[in-house]
Amino acid sequence: FTLRINNRQVLNGLLEQLGLRDQATPILRALDKLAKTDAETVMEEMTRQSTATTEQATKILSLVQVTGTNGEILDQLEKLADGHEATLEGIEALRHVIEGTQAAGVAQDALVLDVSIARGLDYYTGTIYETFLNALPQIGSVCSGGRYDNLTGVYTKQELPGVGASLGLDRLLAAMEELGLLQGHRTPAKLLVTYFDRDRLSDYLRICTALRRRGLAVELF
């Protein structure tokens, strides 16, 4: 698998430098589709759903598509930040994450800095990530999340930071099935007949017998 990470402060800072901070929601939602569609379609959506001009949308796409090693991308982002405080804070946070995973023994080819990762939801405030299966990248992200400060403010006046993640169980199960990682059936029965009324047990037994005579493996429970 590959973890693709980014930081919302970097994205928000870059938008602020372009005078588009108040247009972050529609722009980031458009960027979130970059892995699923082509850049031209994303650019069209950005200009249609926000006040971004074609020139600004082109600049945004060029910024989020920087390439290289994690270290090289961070160096490029620092130059593009041009001293912008929030952007630099996001870049520094990404450095800490990358250094921390290295210290923890995580294979560095499993952690990729991807500035196009946006996580379209508004509440993310810091590091964000999406996880893809190397053998089945087309299945999409199977685990994603990030940091969100003060999301609990919806329910309490106390300011509380938070980090969350979600697993795509349906995608994981589909991937495991396609890769042959799921065990076969543990029971020979194809049908399970359940009953809750002991007084009608004979009726349920007759149903099971009729089904078995049709060649079906049935278990009564």
Tell what function each PLM region has.
Residues 13-18, 124-126:
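Short acidic, glycine/serine/threonine-rich loops at helix termini
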Residues 19-44, 133-135:
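Acidic, His- and aromatic-enriched active-site or binding-groove loops in soluble protein domains
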Residues 12-15, 28, 98:
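Short, well-ordered alpha-helical packing segments
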Residues 1, 9, 43-221:
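Positively charged, Gly/Ser-enriched RNA/tRNA-binding surfaces
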Residues 2-12, 31:
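Short, glycine/charge-rich beta-strand/loop segments that flank catalytic centers
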Residues 5-6, 34-38, 51-54:
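Short acidic alpha-helix initiation/capping motifs at coil-to-helix transition points
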